[in-house]
Amino acid sequence: MTIGNTKQTSAAAPKPTYFDHNFKLEATKVLPGEYVATNRDMLLVTVLGSCVSCCLRDSAANVSGLNHFMLPDALMDSEAAATMPARYGMHAMEILINEMIKLGADRQRMEAKIFGGGNVLKGILKSNIGERNVDFVRQYLAKEGIPVMAEDVLDSYPRKLYFFSRSGRVLVKKIKEVHNRTIFERELSYRERLRRMPLDGSIELF
């Protein structure tokens, strides 16, 4: 199993895991800006607000992966605003696919499921960044010829996602009552990190 941060081009590092007693599986949490690729039978867990996750799987190779990202805001000069969001989104997808290929997956056999993009930051942000994230993932997968087998996107609620890597099964729980601001604070912090991301070519596309 490998993990990385989609802002970096460095090699992926081992990801801490825990045992999920409910599902009786090894599990790991995927935070905003991270991705995980694995050939082990395990549970990938993430909580999504306006961010999106793409669950990818090559069932023949028993290799799966999940990312958790949003597109940067276009709060920059007009030239950068026209190119940076797409460049970052492509990187978030390509780095996951590349790590899966290293584990034996074949890009031509991959299938996708997409989740998230809820309008959970309404009242904080003027634009619906969740809708923009979903549009990007759909367009990217269509262009790459990766079929989307299922999706649960948009709406106004955060989601907790459980991706069973070996079977490809996904359980989604919509969080209609939020008891603390952890989800929102993580996303706003991630958004600020993206706004400060350098535009000097440090994003590597495979």
UniProtKB/Swiss-Prot annotation:
InterPro entries: CheD-like_sf, Chemorcpt_Glu_NH3ase_CheD, Cytotoxic_necrot_fac-like_cat. Transmembrane segments: none annotated. SUPFAM superfamilies: CNF1/YfiH-like putative cysteine hydrolases. Gene3D superfamilies: 3.30.1330.200. One of its GO terms (biological process) is chemotaxis. GO terms for molecular function: protein-glutamine glutaminase activity. The keyword Transferase does not apply. It comes from the Bacteria. The keyword Transport does not apply. It catalyses: L-glutaminyl-[protein] + H2O = L-glutamyl-[protein] + NH4(+). Signal peptide: none annotated. Its EC number is 3.5.1.44. CDD domains: CheD. Keywords: Chemotaxis, Hydrolase. Belongs to the CheD family. Probably deamidates glutamine residues to glutamate on methyl-accepting chemotaxis receptors (MCPs), playing an important role in chemotaxis. PANTHER family: CHEMORECEPTOR GLUTAMINE DEAMIDASE CHED-RELATED. NCBIfam families: PRK13487.1. This is Probable chemoreceptor glutamine deamidase CheD. It comes from Laribacter hongkongensis (strain HLHK9). The lineage of its organism: Bacteria, Pseudomonadati, Pseudomonadota, Betaproteobacteria, Neisseriales. The gene is cheD.
